[in-house]
Design a protein with these regions (language model features):
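Membrane-water interface of transmembrane alpha-helices
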Residues: 20-38, 109-113
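Alpha-helical transmembrane segments and their immediate juxtamembrane interface regions
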Residues: 85-125
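Helical transmembrane-bundle signal
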Residues: 11-22, 66-73, 99-106, 110
C-alpha cells in the first residue's frame, strides 16, 4: 500500500505543479527577460512584449492542462489501489508519460500563438 500511496502522490505532482506554475506565470511573470527562470525560447525572448505574452499564454494553458490532467489522474489510479507493485508501476509510467507529453505539447501551442501574434522580429502583427 505504501508504494501505491507514493506513486499516487508522484502522479499528482505534475498537474499540481502545472496549476501553481501556470498561475504564477500568467499573473506574475519574471520582470526581466532572463535565461534562468520562465518560458525561455528564442521567440519569447525577442522583447518584453513577447516575453509577457508567452508567459500569459503558457500560464493560462498550464492552468487548463493542470485541471484537465488532475481529474483523470485521480480516477485512473483508484482501481489500482490493491494491485501489484508492477501494475502500479506500469500505470504510473503511462500516466506520467501522458503528463510529460502535455507539458512538451504546450510548447508547440505557445510558439504557434507567438508566431501568429508577432512577426519574426517580435513586433505585433
Amino acid at each position: 500500500m505504501w508504494f501505491y500511496i507514493m506513486m499516487f502522490t508522484c502522479n499528482l505532482l505534475i498537474p499540481i505543479v502545472m496549476l501553481i506554475c501556470g498561475f504564477f506565470m500568467s499573473k506574475y511573470p519574471p520582470k526581466e527577460i532572463n535565461g534562468i527562470i520562465g518560458y525561455r525560447t528564442t521567440m519569447s525572448r525577442k522583447n518584453m512584449d513577447t516575453w509577457k505574452f508567452a508567459h500569459d499564454y503558457c500560464g493560462k494553458l498550464w492552468l487548463k492542462l493542470g485541471l484537465l490532467l488532475l481529474t483523470p489522474t485521480i480516477i485512473i489510479q483508484i482501481p489500482f489501489s490493491h494491485s501489484s507493485e508492477n501494475a502500479i508501476g506500469y500505470m504510473t509510467l503511462i500516466v506520467e508519460g501522458i503528463q510529460f507529453v502535455a507539458i512538451l505539447g504546450s510548447i508547440v501551442f505557445v510558439e504557434r500563438a507567438l508566431k501568429k501574434t508577432f512577426d519574426e522580429n517580435g513586433i505585433r502583427r
